[in-house]
């Protein structure tokens, strides 16, 4: 009996020592892990804090590199492996391009994690022809809305009311436009999308498999062309003017000149600090619902994470930690966009109004062919709403559709 006890204690001692060695090795391995994250200035501080919390728990090191948002996508394809990131902040419409080029890795979050997100946010980060795979974890959602200065105009129930009140305020304030919506010489298909969808336009159709079909281009759809005369009317009366850029639109609204401004939640703080009485709503239907584009932003794990030996750690950070309600609440507070995680929804009343304005919205296409659309669609609006000498809308949109089709091939 005594010998048995001795053997048992000896065995327990060996097991304890072995466990201690494994723990020490694990800790050393975690401490050796350095994860590089590329993000933009809006999120850098919050990403550093949130990722730092994960790193402290896991004995890892986080290095955050700040870049202009669009440069994250563009630089990922040219950076040397040694300088490449393991994790990036990304827009969902980058998914097709990055996945097709093998620059990001598919993610496989648990069913419990997936349940915390609206289906469209996960679909937005999914890509594939035969089988779709998830390439990003959603972190924030955004869409534009119609901001109404309620001291200058009533919230319109119809597009005709919007048009009438906008033109009345245009005349009163001696403006060259009725609705403060940004375009500028470069065009802005994103901010013009509610008008585009309301007239019956669409970007790509959907095939029998449920995938976007880049051969079905709706930039000059029959419904849009049938209603193109409305664009000519808006141009003639000055409801919309493509010479208006972002700064002009914002200043006109904040100075109490324009009664209507089309913008997104990134300007929520600006609105709250303006002292104006305002309401955010969806643009009223024209001939069809004037729905906005839906944008989803999140995090992706790059192909370089495996090269750097941190694939497992980077995946855990993104699929489990960045997906959590606590992490997304912190990120939302920093970048002024509602969190994608439904249990982390912001209680901010202005963000809630922008969320309500997203009803029926269309996720921006995430296939590579979308890169061929932005410029020409934006220019169709620029040319047809530039005031004197404008191109008839039907001509402008047919021209854009042909140019897009030629680029896609």
Place the predicted regions along the sequence by residue.
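Glycine-centered hinge/linker elements that transmit conformational signals in sensory
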Residues: 166, 209-243
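Conserved C-terminal helix/tail region of periplasmic/extracytoplasmic solute-binding proteins
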Residues: 359-409
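Extracytoplasmic/periplasmic substrate-recognition and gating elements
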Residues: 153, 272-334, 387, 391, ...
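A structural signal for short loop-to-beta-strand junctions that line the ligand-binding cleft
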Residues: 78, 84-86, 114-150, 288-291, ...
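Hinge/lid segment of periplasmic solute-binding proteins
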Residues: 92-143, 157, 161-163, 280
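Conserved N-terminal structural module of periplasmic/extracytoplasmic solute-binding proteins
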Residues: 2-9, 24-96, 265, 287, ...
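Short helices/loops that flank or line small-molecule/ion binding pockets
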Residues: 73-84, 101, 167-168, 232-234, ...
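Extracytoplasmic/periplasmic solute-binding protein
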Residues: 133-139, 144, 163-213
């Amino acid at each position: 009996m005594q010998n048995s006890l001795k053997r048992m204690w000896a065995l327990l001692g060996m097991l304890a020592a072995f466990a201690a060695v494994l723990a020490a090795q694990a800790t050393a391995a975690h401490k050796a892990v350095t994860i590089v994250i590329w993000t933009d200035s809006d999120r850098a501080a919050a990403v550093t804090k949130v990722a730092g919390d994960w790193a402290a728990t896991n004995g890892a090191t986080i290095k955050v590199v700040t870049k202009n948002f669009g440069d994250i996508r563009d630089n990922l394809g040219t950076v040397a492996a040694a300088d490449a990131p393991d994790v990036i902040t990304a827009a969902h419409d980058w998914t097709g391009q990055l996945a097709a080029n093998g620059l990001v890795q598919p993610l496989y979050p648990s069913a419990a994690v997936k349940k915390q997100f609206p289906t469209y946010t996960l679909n937005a980060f999914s890509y594939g022809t035969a089988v779709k795979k998830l390439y990003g974890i959603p972190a924030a959602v955004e869409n534009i809305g119609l901001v109404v200065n309620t001291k200058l105009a009533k919230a319109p129930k119809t597009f005709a009311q919007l048009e009438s009140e906008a033109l009345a305020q245009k005349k009163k304030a001696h403006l060259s436009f009725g609705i403060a919506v940004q375009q500028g010489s470069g065009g802005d298909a994103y901010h013009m999308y509610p008008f585009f969808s309301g007239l019956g336009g669409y970007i790509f159709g959907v095939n029998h498999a449920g995938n976007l079909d880049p051969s079905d281009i709706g930039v000059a759809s029959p419904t849009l062309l049938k209603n193109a005369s409305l664009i000519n009317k808006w141009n003639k009366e000055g409801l919309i003017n493509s010479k208006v850029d972002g700064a002009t639109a914002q200043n006109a609204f904040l100075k109490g000149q324009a009664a209507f401004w089309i913008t997104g939640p990134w300007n929520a703080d600006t609105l709250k600090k303006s002292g104006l009485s305002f309401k955010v709503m969806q643009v009223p239907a024209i001939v069809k619902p004037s729905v906005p584009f839906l944008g989803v932003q999140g995090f992706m794990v790059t192909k370089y994470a495996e090269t750097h030996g941190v694939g497992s750690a980077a995946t855990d950070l993104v699929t489990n930690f960045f997906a959590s309600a606590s992490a997304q609440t912190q990120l939302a507070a920093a970048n002024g966009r509602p969190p994608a995680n439904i249990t982390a929804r912001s209680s901010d009343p202005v963000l809630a109004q922008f969320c309500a304005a997203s009803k029926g919205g269309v996720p921006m296409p995430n296939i590579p062919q979308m890169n061929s659309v932005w410029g020409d669609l934006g220019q169709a609006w620029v040319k047809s709403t530039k005031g004197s000498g404008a191109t008839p809308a039907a001509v402008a949109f047919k021209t854009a559709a042909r140019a897009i089709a030629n680029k896609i091939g």
